[in-house]
Amino acid sequence: MMNRRTFLIISFVTAVVFSLPNALFGEQLAPFKLYDTHGHFYTNEPDKYPFDASRARYGPERMIAKAMAHPMTPEVVFKFWDEVGIELGCGVQYNSTYRTDNSYLLDISAKYPKRIIPIVILDPVDQATPGTLAQMAKRNKIAGVRFTGVPDKKTGSFIFMTDAAKGAWTAANDLGLVIVLMPLGPMQPAMKQVAEMADRYPNVNIVLDHIGFPDLKKAPDTFGLLPEHLVLASRRNVYYKYTTLLMEMVMEANVPLKDFLHFMTGVYGADHMVWGTDIGNSEVPLKEFVQMAIDSADGLTLKQKKAIFYDTAKAVFVPGGRGPKHTD
């Protein structure tokens, strides 16, 4: 019969083993470590973590049904990560399930700090947000915050990149936090505002979700990059996220993924590219898409591949922030 001491030892060892990445045990799809910058976590415990799916991509009913039937808990996500050789990744707060209630993400990232690096969602114009960012950086070791939305109907500006959000941006700049941006709608004005914010807040590393949604039909010669996308290459604090969702868009346009990634790498540099699976959101065979992402890097140097799939993300997403920028 197992005594309490033996049970506790077994439980502890099991927890430690579960928290370790697959690089120590199983197969890998690439001969280098992977860092997933775009993982969404949610659970089917609405009594403890209430849903707010009012802005879900496919509607609240479908989102809640999906979360209840197929929760994206650490157990589920880690199993997938281990299958493909992902060492760690960003837990990106999922607007479709919890909006700005980051409770679940912060609870699981506290439990698994070596595998989940939290990126929260907060109201960019709320006066409480600057203080909340400082508190979360210190207490919860967040690496950044994510802002998304459509432009204002009257001004055409994205409010999270205006003076209305100055407090949040200033706090992130002081703390050295990442701001992940996913503007929705017309990309020309959005990318202009991104350039302005990059200049104004040089200690904020801006990460563009889905590389700012290149318009492959509008600008086929530049693989969808508009002049406003291209000019961002001169801003060294802007980074670009190559994701499963973006890969779907590229494939739908009948553009070879390899050609697309090579062009993006040529424009922005591998040291400014990161990669993410979009697990929890994209409804595709993810293991196949991970392999396709890796294969699309064929022809790049090993150093470039490591940068895109691990090194850049590890340098950019710093738990707790990088701190204030020091100038000599």
Segments and roles (model prediction):
Residues G39-F41, Q93-Y94, V120-P124, R146-G149, ...:
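A cross-domain feature marking catalytic cores of carbohydrate-active enzymes
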Residues P46-P50, S103, G131-L133, V194, ...:
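Short aromatic-enriched loop/helix-cap "lid" or pocket-rim segments at secondary-structure transitions
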Residues A143, F158-W275, G323-T327:
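Catalytic pocket-lining loop regions of alpha/beta-barrel enzymes
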Residues Q28-G167, L175:
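Mid-domain alpha/beta scaffold segments of enzyme catalytic cores
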Residues Y42-E45, S96-R99, V125-A128, D152-K154, ...:
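Active-site environment of divalent metal-dependent phosphoester hydrolases
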Residues H38, W81, L105, A172, ...:
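Conserved, mostly hydrophobic/aromatic
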Residues R4-L20, Q28-T37, P46-E83, E87-L88, ...:
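Mid-to-C-terminal alpha-helical segments outside catalytic/metal-binding sites
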